[in-house]
């Protein structure tokens, strides 16, 4: 019997994925460590205070730039997700009991780190009556109460599209409300079986209607075509998405979806230009871009674009 690292039995899909060896990365999938004073100070602070960020724990290649800008990302809700996406390295299983003190601790970490901009993401909590809506909203409120000058970006699951859950989250007032579509309609069910493409677009529309700046992400290299990417970008813009990031899929382990292709840097430039032509207020595209990369800068760009459009 094959088992995953966390001890559970492998799904048939994971067994099939594992038959494809881990792919060798092309030469452009690399980053240079530019270690500046802000990064060094934050690194020492995080180690000294025993703080936890997605940036370090996920080995993000952009940590040097983001920490130099005093930006960081936090994961809430535990380390077990009730859903399984075929690209995601977070384990699927039964989550621990809800930790109602977590919002305070995250807010304390933001203050201790002196962050200018904080991104908060988390696992899906379908085991909870509200799907975890309180936790997401409470974390934003706690950060803002303790750090009034810090921008907050909230990356959420879909909460099954339930209006009351979404409204609770929206009312917490993050600077940016993000929900990642991640892939194109044709392969969506294969990649994100617990989500639906249209429901994800609906979350973004609801956030826009609530007056929030909205954001989403597309991962390339999962089997989509270039035409499908352009169509998905159009769908996102039509849904009211203000900011989009476009990234290269990097396979976390052999049990995850194989990399179908390595998208060349010049293709990312073309997709970025196409997205800008559609009217997105903020666009970042590249092999090592991640959805929270330069999040604060993208928010400022989108806010300025909105202000100009309203004149």
Swiss-Prot record:
Cofactors that this protein relies on: [4Fe-4S] cluster
Residues annotated as binding [4Fe-4S] cluster 1 are: 55, 60, 66, 292
Q: Give the pathway.
A: Protein modification; protein lipoylation via endogenous pathway; protein N(6)-(lipoyl)lysine from octanoyl-[acyl-carrier-protein]: step 2/2
Question: Which reactions does this protein catalyse?
Answer: [[Fe-S] cluster scaffold protein carrying a second [4Fe-4S](2+) cluster] + N(6)-octanoyl-L-lysyl-[protein] + 2 oxidized [2Fe-2S]-[ferredoxin] + 2 S-adenosyl-L-methionine + 4 H(+) = [[Fe-S] cluster scaffold protein] + N(6)-[(R)-dihydrolipoyl]-L-lysyl-[protein] + 4 Fe(3+) + 2 hydrogen sulfide + 2 5'-deoxyadenosine + 2 L-methionine + 2 reduced [2Fe-2S]-[ferredoxin]
Disulphide-bridged cysteine pairs? none
Q: Can you give the residue ranges of the Radical SAM core domain?
A: 67-281
Q: Which GO terms describe its cellular component?
A: cytoplasm
- Alphabetized UniProt keyword annotations: 4Fe-4S, Cytoplasm, Iron, Iron-sulfur, Metal-binding, S-adenosyl-L-methionine, Transferase
- What does the entry comment about cofactor binding? Binds 2 [4Fe-4S] clusters per subunit. One cluster is coordinated with 3 cysteines and an exchangeable S-adenosyl-L-methionine.
Listed binding positions for [4Fe-4S] cluster 2 are 81, 85, 88
Q: Does the keyword ATP-binding apply?
A: no
GO terms of molecular function: 4 iron, 4 sulfur cluster binding; lipoate synthase activity; metal ion binding
Its EC number(s): 2.8.1.8
User: Subcellular localization, per the record?
Assistant: Cytoplasm
> What NCBIfam families does its record include?
lipA, PRK05481.1, PRK12928.1
Q: How does it assemble?
A: Forms a complex with GcvH, the H protein of the glycine cleavage system. The strength of association is dependent on the presence of S-adenosyl-L-methionine.
> Under what name is this protein listed?
Lipoyl synthase
State the species of origin: Mycobacterium tuberculosis (strain ATCC 25618 / H37Rv)
Which gene is annotated as encoding this protein in its UniProt record?
lipA
